[in-house]
From Swiss-Prot:
Gene Ontology biological process terms in this record: DNA replication proofreading; tRNA processing
The encoding gene: rnt
Role this protein plays: Trims short 3' overhangs of a variety of RNA species, leaving a one or two nucleotide 3' overhang. Responsible for the end-turnover of tRNA: specifically removes the terminal AMP residue from uncharged tRNA (tRNA-C-C-A). Also appears to be involved in tRNA biosynthesis.
Entry's Gene Ontology cellular component terms: cytosol
Cofactor(s) essential for the protein: Mg(2+)
Protein name: Ribonuclease T
EC number: 3.1.13.-
One of the Pfam families matching this protein, by short name: RNase_T
Positions with a binding annotation for Mg(2+) 1: D26
PANTHER family from the UniProt entry: DNA POLYMERASE III SUBUNIT EPSILON (PTHR30231), RIBONUCLEASE T (PTHR30231:SF2)
Lineage, opening ranks: Bacteria, Pseudomonadati, Pseudomonadota, Gammaproteobacteria, Pasteurellales
Gene Ontology MF, one: RNA exonuclease activity, producing 5'-phosphomonoesters
Native source organism of the sequence: Haemophilus influenzae (strain PittEE)
Amino acid sequence: MSDSQEIPYHNQLKNRFRGYFPVIIDVETAGFDAKKDALLELAAITLKMDENGYLHPDQKCHFHIEPFEGANINPESLKFNGIDIHNPLRGAVSELDAITGLFQMIRRGQKDADCQRSIIVAHNAAFDQSFVMAAAERTGVKRNPFHPFGMFDTASLAGLMFGQTVLVKACLAAKIPFDGKQAHSALYDTERTAELFCYMVNHLKDLGGFPHISQIDETENTAENQTAL
């Protein structure tokens, strides 16, 4: 008997989000236009589910990125995120290397979890998704694992659960420590967003909100039918 057969249906990651593999993303940029402004930093964290159905952060990657040729650089954006694009200690790589490394990590995790496609999880997710997709298009990297427009927005989810939409306030509501001095570092924000998303998913489970009673009945009926066959 395989591991997936031994673990209850709703305690398998592939069955939690309809076959989607959730990946936490955060980007730091030189503006708001994903087509024209530079992508300067990117971090991602994949998730795993334990045998009891609880979600946890798993693998991570982090890249400082060189502005693509002809990219706009908004000085106000650099002042906001504190990035010095001319600092050689950044260790910046090309967009091609960053997106290639990101997709390789995600495809491995997606395969291991037996999921069919990946989905971006981010705080104000439309922003992060637009920059990742624009970079993927510019670089021509094949086999983009992400759904082209679907996403999970932790700002919306936190607004529903806590009445808070700002990342730091949502984290504090979930009793997740947040160091404001490290905010707007892509890796730090991704780590906190991953903790927040896992907390919300796990808390819903603890409250009895997932699986829903209708899903439990449906799963049991499916299992009975398979046994009968």
